[in-house]
């Protein structure tokens, strides 16, 4: 494969030559899996997604030009799934299954177009939202985040000359390769790329994926980025996200329905998917409450993805829960994916080795770790904690509690109501860096 001189490309690019989002497949695989279920079961549900910058010290509206942002968002709205992409989605095996996407769904997807957006500025931040049918607005999440993160990177590098850019990328590559060599030393490790949404740039994510493929071989199990999976003959990986229980909870008409929302999601999911796709994401309203009230059949699922508790602490609680239900953790799977750095991966791997099957979804610290790489002192290339969350469903506020209160989203009064219902056990505030 021909290698791209990223530094030269950055120095020479204009947005028209290098649109940030090149394809509707430039998204996370779980968005397509969730989309099929939404399309099939909830086509009449409306949902609003909103940008949330948790790194409030970074004033995005001061760093990113509004005209450039609108150009990139508008360009994304011109994209359609190509014939090649549709053939690949329809004919490829995913998680060992042929035709995981129904022909009727693919026929609908062929005409898909991202809906309109609302953009304004307030107190140095962008207010960006997407409202309409859930089966359309859901696909804005990943491209919106990728666009804003890459525009911020481009703005930071605009003052760099060719030599400074060479130094920047040389240092970043060396930093990334040093991490790769450390991971290679862990026998049986399984690493995947989960870094699309907060990546430095598309070209950089592509380089990181190629580096992992070259550097750790079969230990690199694939990528969540569908376009990169297709282009690099890799497995497309991902299951489901917090938006499903958040929407189901928002639509609940009683406290009983609200408490059952996380499990109704799993029941609906199982109608569409099975096997290795039966991965539980337990922390939308707190892992402790999820495990406390979970029906016994949840223990039959393949595994869990603990996403906001410290990985060792959160993983041990799930192992204990399995044992209490007569399940052997060695036959189960834990997928760790929350803000992982190579040190966290090493520590978690060593702790759980021999106790449970493990996989690591490596995100922002894989695809956007430029701290200390610039030839001049700056923090403008440091990654920030930027999310695009569902904030309303059919006009009702949507809430995420999380195991980490710093990651909670939603209306304050609704958060208080959810806490009364689900409880606050084991919720511990931690610094959210990415």
Swiss-Prot record:
GO terms for biological process: NAD biosynthetic process via the salvage pathway. This is Nicotinate phosphoribosyltransferase. It comes from Mesorhizobium japonicum (strain LMG 29417 / CECT 9101 / MAFF 303099) (Mesorhizobium loti (strain MAFF 303099)). Transiently phosphorylated on a His residue during the reaction cycle. Phosphorylation strongly increases the affinity for substrates and increases the rate of nicotinate D-ribonucleotide production. Dephosphorylation regenerates the low-affinity form of the enzyme, leading to product release. It catalyses: nicotinate + 5-phospho-alpha-D-ribose 1-diphosphate + ATP + H2O = nicotinate beta-D-ribonucleotide + ADP + phosphate + diphosphate. Belongs to the NAPRTase family. It is an enzyme of class 6 (ligase). Keywords: Ligase, Phosphoprotein, Pyridine nucleotide biosynthesis. GO terms for molecular function: nicotinate phosphoribosyltransferase activity. The keyword Phosphoprotein applies. Catalyzes the synthesis of beta-nicotinate D-ribonucleotide from nicotinate and 5-phospho-D-ribose 1-phosphate at the expense of ATP. Transmembrane segments: none annotated. The modification Phosphohistidine is found at residue 242.
